[in-house]
Amino acid sequence: METQRNYPSLWRWGTLILGMLLICSVVGNLWVTVYYGVPVWKEAKTTLFCASDAKAYDTERHNVWATHACVPTDPNPQEMVLENVTETFNMWVNDMVEQMHTDIISLWDQSLKPCVKLTPLCVTLDCSSVNATNVTKSNNSTDINIGEIQEQRNCSFNVTTAIRDKNQKVHALFYRADIVQIDEGERNKSDNHYRLINCNTSVIKQACPKVSFEPIPIHYCAPAGFAILKCNGKKFNGTGPCTNVSTVQCTHGIRPVVSTQLLLNGSLAEVEEVIIRSKNITDNTKNIIVQLNEPVQINCTRTGNNTRKSIRIGPGQAFYATGDIIGDIRRAYCNISGKQWNETLHKVITKLGSYFDNKTIILQPPAGGDIEIITHSFNCGGEFFYCNTTKLFNSTWTNSSYTNDTYNSNSTEDITGNITLQCKIKQIVNMWQRVGQAMYAPPIRGNITCISNITGLILTFDRNNTNNVTFRPGGGDMRDNWRSELYKYKVVKIEPLGVAPTEARRRVVEREKRAVGMGAFFLGFLGAAGSTMGAASITLTVQARQLLSGIVQQQSNLLRAIQAQQHMLQLTVWGIKQLQARVLAVERYLKDQQLLGIWGCSGKLICTTNVPWNSSWSNKSLDEIWDNMTWMEWDKQINNYTDEIYRLLEVSQNQQEKNEQDLLALDKWANLWNWFSITNWLWYIRIFIMIVGGIIGLRIVFAVLSIVNRVRQGYSPLSLQTLIPNQRGPDRPREIEEEGGEQDRDRSIRLVNGFLPLVWEDLRNLCLFSYRRLRDLLSIVARTVELLGRRGWEALKLLGNLLLYWGQELKNSAISLLNTTAIAVAEGTDRIIELVQRAWRAILHIPRRIRQGFERALL
């Protein structure tokens, strides 16, 4: 009875605890949520395309930079400052530099591809000195060395005419540096026989007469899906973290000036001092790039009104050479303000001294090498100048001379007047992009003057001893020229897809989940062609991904084919890059949209899912994630688990689509109007026939059972119309008027006539039979549950009593063990103390025993 009274409270408390557990389990779960458009990026290498205002600078279509093929620049460029962002830059490992270097080489090669090869000019040249006509000298001609009248030679040679079997003798003017004397032996050596300098080392190609080398600013732009990060730190040295970061779509206009030693027409530092940039300032094998904060103007001139003439060197080929020199035959030269140069040099030396412990700094010209390295080489008005910079780099700066605000140095140059640099002009120019190839630059008519700004220097250094550091001008690797402008840029790939935990869960069609074998995800796109429709539907995600991969691979193959046939299609490098950029943008967009579609998130910026968040990915709370972390920090934390999360999203969406497909199969029951459709009438007739057949079958079964039952009782009805009373036991008398007794609740069983009464009677009997059996079954189940509950409760009580009993026994045993241990320890301690005391007394009694021994001995 006590147990039965405890049942209601037990069930009440059990239900309450179960509800609390369910609520806690629902509240505590986190689910993966997909976000599209998160501000996350990663370093990447991609194809950049160009933007330029070529028409604003030069209408000549044959400009070597082919900027007419670039897209127009944005009149309102957008630059977004990234607050609280620190990004690492490295100008020495920058794919933008390598890409620009490759582009400029391709442009030079393409511009010179259709030009004439000067192989027919590799003949013997009969040369003599040149006499100028109408020579006039200005008053300041003393600034320039006039004793250089042998700079050019008038050479005659035989060439093939339009008719191949006929030769013609022509003459042309060559610079002395472009020809070498032929050594035919000591006996037959002639001072008048020469050849072109590059005939035995490389193929010479003439620059087309319409090609212009005037640099035009080129803006490098990132395609859609990518961005260019820009460091706006004014003292940024090119490597390390930058805290002032912005994002742009295009760089500033970069003039691809090909020069050595001095950087021309570049960007300036925005601080009061020069900026020193080097991969390792202590490594003398690494170049040092100096960015000036103020420009130094350099004015270069080639005097003389030269003429140009065309010489036929074969069928369909023409060679352009200098005809006559009218005016001063002097070399070309450049002028630089001495005061301005020395002020700039003082800033450079002061900055270098801070890196080299204020040692004595020596500036010297290059020790040796090719003429392009030992001189300042550049292009001026179509002519290639090679200027001697010894006057610029020939001084010694002690610690006291550059740490003070003075410009004192051990130099013989006048720092107040102009510094004049002697220059040579070469028609045969070694190509800077590769070894073993040269170019013949046709002469330019008339006077040539170009004014440029020196915005940087390229230096090398060597340590003479512990007190001196020698710096020399360097260059030759044009990557340093591009690096001096691209130091503050880097290309990143925008990752708009992000996943994070939230408490929101997608409401889905629940269904028992089946395990999907991992092998299904590795089937090929066509590998499921022979599978069943059900098996192939599992690989739809893989097929969609591989379909896009096939498109991407096809586009890549097309681009490679176009690049291979670039010379046939007459496409510039910019055309190839624009095609690549546009295809790449489409591929990036399709890839993101493909993933969103696979996850069931098409067209959504925030998409909840049914994938539970695993704490092993990140065990941070929602407040720590959403209130204290940026998307970049969060992406770095879960980057190792992104692939796993993506896979689970695909599996979840596949299961959801399968459940929806199964639900649609039952969806026709949701619309009652469809029940009255004519197409369903045959189904209704079939169902009716099945019901009637079932009733008839049940009637037959019950009739057979009734007959069998009566036969077993030994009674047979006389007629189908006879009312058959139920049999009563001898202990149950019928009720009569005079006596009491049990009420007669029994009825006679009447056999009915007709189909409908028969159906009704059978249905009634069937329902009563089912009801009674179900009632009996429920009664049995209730009694069983009650019994199990009582037995379970008694077992729990017994288990509780056992736990209490054994807990008390363990407690008593522990107390007894502790007491025994304490007693044993106490007894042992007492014995140890007693032994120590005895030993101590024995030690104390040693002198007494010795004294007693002596006393006995004396007695």
Swiss-Prot record:
The residues exposed to the Cytoplasmic compartment are 709-859
**Residue window of motif YXXL motif:** 715-718
User: Keyword Membrane on this protein?
Assistant: yes
Q: Which CDD domains match?
A: HIV-1-like_HR1-HR2
Molecular-function GO term, any one: structural molecule activity
Which residues are annotated as site, described as Cleavage?
R514, A515
Specify where the region named Disordered lies, as residue ranges: 724-743
According to the UniProt record, one GO cellular component term is: host cell plasma membrane
Question: Region Immunosuppression: which residues?
Answer: 577-595
- For region V1, the annotated ranges are 127-154
Description of post-translational modifications: Highly glycosylated by host. The high number of glycan on the protein is reffered to as 'glycan shield' because it contributes to hide protein sequence from adaptive immune system.
Annotated region described as V2, given as residue ranges: 155-199
**Gene Ontology BP terms:** clathrin-dependent endocytosis of virus by host cell; fusion of virus membrane with host endosome membrane; fusion of virus membrane with host plasma membrane; positive regulation of plasma membrane raft polarization; positive regulation of receptor clustering; viral protein processing; virion attachment to host cell
Ranges in coiled-coil conformation: 636-670
Signal sequence extent: 1-28
Q: Does the keyword Coiled coil apply?
A: yes
Question: Which superkingdom does the taxonomy of this entry point to?
Answer: Viruses
Q: Where is this motif: Di-leucine internalization motif?
A: 858-859
Q: Where is this region: V4?
A: 387-423
Record key words, sorted: AIDS, Apoptosis, Clathrin-mediated endocytosis of virus by host, Cleavage on pair of basic residues, Coiled coil, Disulfide bond, Fusion of virus membrane with host endosomal membrane, Fusion of virus membrane with host membrane, Glycoprotein, Host cell membrane, Host endosome, Host membrane, Host-virus interaction, Lipoprotein, Membrane, Palmitate, Signal, Transmembrane, Transmembrane helix, Viral attachment to host cell, Viral envelope protein, Viral immunoevasion, Viral penetration into host cytoplasm, Virion, Virus endocytosis by host, Virus entry into host cell
Q: List the disulfide bonds.
A: C50-C70, C115-C208, C122-C199, C127-C155, C221-C250, C231-C242, C300-C334, C380-C450, C387-C423, C601-C607
Q: Relay the record's extra comment.
A: Inhibitors targeting HIV-1 viral envelope proteins are used as antiretroviral drugs. Attachment of virions to the cell surface via non-specific interactions and CD4 binding can be blocked by inhibitors that include cyanovirin-N, cyclotriazadisulfonamide analogs, PRO 2000, TNX 355 and PRO 542. In addition, BMS 806 can block CD4-induced conformational changes. Env interactions with the coreceptor molecules can be targeted by CCR5 antagonists including SCH-D, maraviroc (UK 427857) and aplaviroc (GW 873140), and the CXCR4 antagonist AMD 070. HIV-1 lineages are divided in three main groups, M (for Major), O (for Outlier), and N (for New, or Non-M, Non-O). The vast majority of strains found worldwide belong to the group M. Group O seems to be endemic to and largely confined to Cameroon and neighboring countries in West Central Africa, where these viruses represent a small minority of HIV-1 strains. The group N is represented by a limited number of isolates from Cameroonian persons. The group M is further subdivided in 9 clades or subtypes (A to D, F to H, J and K).
The family classification in the record reads: Belongs to the HIV-1 env protein family.
Reproduce the free-text note on domains from the UniProt record.
Some of the most genetically diverse regions of the viral genome are present in Env. They are called variable regions 1 through 5 (V1 through V5). Coreceptor usage of gp120 is determined mainly by the primary structure of the third variable region (V3) in the outer domain of gp120. The sequence of V3 determines which coreceptor, CCR5 and/or CXCR4 (corresponding to R5/macrophage, X4/T cell and R5X4/T cell and macrophage tropism), is used to trigger the fusion potential of the Env complex, and hence which cells the virus can infect. Binding to CCR5 involves a region adjacent in addition to V3. The membrane proximal external region (MPER) present in gp41 is a tryptophan-rich region recognized by the antibodies 2F5, Z13, and 4E10. MPER seems to play a role in fusion.
This chain belongs to which protein, by name?
Envelope glycoprotein gp160
What does the organism's lineage look like at the top? Answer: Viruses, Riboviria, Pararnavirae, Artverviricota, Revtraviricetes
- Underlying gene: env
